[in-house]
Amino acid sequence: METAQKEEFTRVQRVSDNKYNLITADGKLLSKQWFDWIDYFHEGFAIVRREDYLTNFIDKQGKLLSEEWFSWVNDFKDGLAVGQRTNGEYFKIDKQGKILVVSE
């Protein structure tokens, strides 16, 4: 497995299918779900990407921020993140998963 250390988690890559997850300091997987990519945490959330290239956020308890998956998202900055929905709408999302601003 390839590993990269950042914060209190270690990113690991499963060799059989090249999927990523995070391992906690006590050796437990952060999420039951494996992802095509997991970024580092910014303001308590890491960007995750699925096989279909859609993105979301995962928190430090392994919970996805939103039920909706997005075309792309940026890291959180000052409590908000910017992204684009699959229908082309741009948005801002807060740390509770609430879509605050939507525009085309």
Residue ranges and their predicted role:
Residues 1-104:
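Residue-level detector of conserved, function-critical positions
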